[in-house]
Amino acid sequence: MEILDLTQTLINFPYPGDPELRIIEKKIDGFIVSEIIMGSHLCTHIDYPKHVGLENRIPFKDGIIKGKGYCISLDDFERNKLPACDILLIYTGFSKYWGRDEYFEKIPEIPFLDDIIKSNIKCVGIDACTIGGFEEHKRLLSNNILIIENLNENLKNLVGKSFYFLGLPLKIFDIDASPIRCIAIL
């Protein structure tokens, strides 16, 4: 069994205009306690329907994102050939720009969103800062398909493979997004 971590390390690299990461150490009764302040879309995160003004409906028990995963490459995807899976991951190669300004300048175009919406996919993830603009988000989220953004470069090792996917967001349900820890088990 092999486990691949698909999560970006939590660093102060917010989308332009989003809240920055701040960690404030406090000493309380001899202990160090850190106060962590950050936006809900910092680094690897999951978007919920509330992100686009919809009521949150989460298609996974207890909010744990798990199931059969499959990864495709944006470059060589053949239209109408979506694999049968619960979680579809899309490798764009944009993750190689992580930590640099150009990462936010590269917005992928996903020409097969209609195919994803017509499928039984419950969650789609990508190694880019976004899966698209407001309309793309709303189309997916209104069809009860959750979105994971900012996956790391390990995604390239999964292209063309099936695996078991496990994503653990914070256990907060009435929120627009949450940081999430994502792994693939091969």
UniProtKB/Swiss-Prot annotation:
GO molecular function terms listed in the Swiss-Prot or TrEMBL record: arylformamidase activity
Example of a GO biological process term: L-tryptophan catabolic process to kynurenine
Top-rank taxon: Archaea
InterPro entries, alphabetized: KFase/CYL, KFase_sf
Name of the protein in question: Uncharacterized protein MJ0783
Organism placement in taxonomy: Archaea, Methanobacteriati, Methanobacteriota, Methanomada group, Methanococci
